[in-house]
Amino acid sequence: GDLAQSIYDYRSIDNWSDVISQSFDNDCKLEYLLKSYRTTMEIMNSANLVLSHIGLKTATPVIRHGEDVRYLKIKENDYNRILERVNLLKEKDYQSIALISRDTDEAKEMADNLAKLGLDIKSIGEDNVDYDSGICSLSSELSKGLEFDAVILTDASEDKYSSKDNTDMKNLYVSMTRPLHELEILYDGEITLPLKEEAEKTFIKR
């Protein structure tokens, strides 16, 4: 399994040492699969900043280049500007676009408010997980295992993804590695620490 995606503390492990000693009596060989085939090099390099922060092995992206990860400082409830960002992605004819929030309540609120502005968007929750294509809003936890053409993280601030909390960091990593082609990271206030330096260099002013 991928330790970086073990987002549930009550049923996850921090390393393989205990498993090797307790389940295999140290009689096994541990191999690491470090290739990433989903995302572009640019997205994976940014996501690796999160892994490095929590001391996990970083993934090696296959040689597929794309656009740089984009950072935009924006108020969490500035739905008109968020809609602008979604529409820019829609113009590229992507089949699947996801807005990923920290939890399900935030994801539903995002979907409801964007729908009021006329966006055709589906809210994905624990009781409503059907999704084929189009634009959707969901939590970081529910995004695990899914992939989209493009992803917008709705708020990657330190308040939402604490750099001192490994579960937050793993959820951030999961969210960042969902897109096939493009990743845009919005944040309100201070961006989470692992992404701070990169965001300061590459943020979008408008």
Regions found by a protein language model. Name each.
Residues G1-R206:
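Conserved helicase motor core of SF1/SF2 NTP-dependent helicases
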